[in-house]
């Protein structure tokens, strides 16, 4: 039992000897796709030179090329396809001048990539996995039975090599095509958002949801069949361990296991990456909406001021006392109504300044508990502090008190695993759950 393989130098020498090369500008690629499409409609899979010229004429018209030299250009294109091993030409002495053309495996592979493989189908993937599962089960049963070298080659190695491995490659190709489609969707979303983000929101949502759904369907289908496939591969691997002459089968099984792991792993990673991109797009849209809201208001205000003498207007405001009473202790509850939206930097600076002052005061006051080794009941302490501040500051003050308290020590009751009782800390329903700190 042997495995066909070639080294890199051998492959390079082979490609150089046969003068392999592919050059497909967009018009030639379009011609090849047209040939493949027309060829798929024929039962015999053969095309005459006249049919190829007709296909080339359609492509030439689509590219708005001159029709005067279409015969010469079509002949050059056909000869170029034959030279690049995309088409096979067959001639007969009895019908001289009427050659027959067939697509080569290379030509079929290229056109399949652009035509057939672009469509993702959960049913197609399910059928592929069903076929793989059947082949693997038969191979595992044959491996468990054992036999001579011919038995292993025909009933185990051959199905794994020429059926299972090829379907795994097809699934891997489907994933790579999905990668390209994701990138294309990202480009489409970027173009939509750059043009008009308002009109693009619904289109972006549709593209995001469709791609997410397709990725999830692909991954769910793979994970549903993955365990059974791995189990049968392990059965074959266990059967080969008692045979020293089956290293080729063992290596093939290892490669298939690695490929299956890679397929399932990349499927999940692809979903995670797409989720991150989805969040990024939604964050961008939210930011754009906020910026646009402020920009529209500023633009309307600027325009109103500029056109005041042509179109006078009057400013009407309500609740004048609240607007003028800037020293009111309860103004924190109405900051957004009076002054509008603060930039994030100013909000952070205001909160940070208050936090530093409160933290220093609270830290100094709580240090007495540590000095005297007195138990610190967080529920009572927090309630006393909150009684000194308006309701709008309760959350921030409670967070500072708790943060400073837990730095002093720990509660030995925490190590018992029993939950602490909930204690009310203000008259508005806020509660805290914490054991008494008694070890500093």
Curated annotation (Swiss-Prot):
GO biological process, one term: cell division
Keyword annotations of the record: Calcium, Cell cycle, Cell division, Chromosome partition, Cytoplasm, DNA condensation
Example of a GO MF term: calcium ion binding
GO terms under cellular component: cytoplasm; nucleoid
Region feature Leucine-zipper, mapped onto this chain: 208-236
Pfam families xrefs: KicB, MukF_C, MukF_M
Gene3D superfamilies per record: Chromosome partition protein MukF, middle domain (1.20.58.590), MukF, C-terminal domain (1.10.225.40), Winged helix-like DNA-binding domain superfamily/Winged helix DNA-binding domain (1.10.10.10)
Subcellular locations according to the entry: Cytoplasm, Nucleoid
CDD domains with a match to the protein in the record: MukF_C (cd16337), MukF_N (cd16335)
Function noted in UniProt: Involved in chromosome condensation, segregation and cell cycle progression. May participate in facilitating chromosome segregation by condensation DNA from both sides of a centrally located replisome during cell division. Not required for mini-F plasmid partitioning. Probably acts via its interaction with MukB and MukE. Overexpression results in anucleate cells. It has a calcium binding activity.
HAMAP family given in the database record: MukF
Family: Belongs to the MukF family.
NCBIfam families the UniProt entry points to: PRK05260.1
Assembly description: Interacts, and probably forms a ternary complex, with MukE and MukB via its C-terminal region. The complex formation is stimulated by calcium or magnesium. It is required for an interaction between MukE and MukB.
Stated name of the protein: Chromosome partition protein MukF
Organism encoding this protein: Salmonella gallinarum (strain 287/91 / NCTC 13346)
């Amino acid at each position: 039992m042997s495995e066909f393989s070639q080294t890199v130098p051998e492959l390079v020498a082979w490609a150089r000897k046969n003068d392999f090369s592919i050059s497909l500008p967009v018009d030639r690629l379009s011609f090849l796709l047209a040939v493949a499409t027309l060829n798929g409609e024929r039962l015999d899979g053969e095309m005459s030179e006249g049919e190829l010229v007709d296909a080339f004429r359609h492509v030439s018209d689509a590219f708005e090329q001159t029709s005067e030299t279409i015969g010469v250009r079509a002949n050059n294109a056909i000869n170029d396809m034959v030279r690049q091993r995309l088409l096979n030409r067959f001639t007969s002495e009895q019908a001289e001048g009427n050659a027959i053309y067939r697509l080569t495996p290379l030509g079929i592979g290229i056109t399949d990539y652009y035509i057939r493989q672009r469509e993702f189908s959960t049913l197609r993937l399910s059928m592929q996995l069903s076929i793989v599962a059947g082949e693997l089960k038969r191979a595992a049963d044959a491996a468990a039975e054992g036999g001579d070298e011919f038995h292993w080659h025909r009933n185990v190695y051959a199905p794994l090599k020429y059926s299972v491995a090829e379907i795994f490659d097809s699934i891997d190709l489907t994933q790579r095509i999905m990668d390209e489609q994701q990138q294309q969707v990202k480009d489409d979303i970027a173009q939509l958002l750059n043009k008009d983000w308002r009109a693009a929101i619904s289109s972006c949502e549709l593209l995001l949801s469709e791609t997410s759904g397709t990725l999830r369907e692909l991954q769910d289908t793979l994970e549903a069949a993955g365990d059974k496939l791995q189990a049968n591969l392990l059965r074959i691997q266990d059967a080969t361990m008692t045979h020293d002459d089956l290293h080729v089968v063992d290596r093939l099984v290892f490669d298939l296991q690695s490929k299956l792991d890679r397929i399932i792993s990349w499927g999940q990673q692809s979903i995670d990456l797409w989720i991150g991109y989805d969040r990024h797009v939604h964050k961008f849209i939210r930011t754009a909406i906020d910026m646009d809201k402020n920009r529209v208001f500023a633009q309307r205000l600027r325009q109103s001021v500029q056109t005041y003498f042509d179109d006078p207007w009057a400013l009407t405001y309500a609740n004048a006392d609240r607007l003028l009473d800037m020293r009111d202790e309860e103004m924190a509850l109405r900051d957004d109504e009076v002054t509008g939206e603060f930039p994030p930097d100013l909000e952070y600076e205001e909160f940070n300044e208050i936090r530093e002052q409160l933290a220093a005061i609270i830290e100094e006051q709580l240090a007495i508990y540590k000095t005297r080794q007195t138990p610190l009941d967080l529920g009572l302490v927090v309630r006393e502090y909150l009684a000194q501040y308006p309701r709008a500051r309760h959350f921030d003050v409670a967070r500072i008190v708790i943060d400073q308290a837990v730095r002093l020590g720990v509660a030995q009751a925490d190590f018992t695993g029993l939950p602490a009782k909930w204690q009310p800390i203000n008259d508005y329903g806020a509660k805290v759950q914490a054991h008494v700190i008694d070890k500093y």
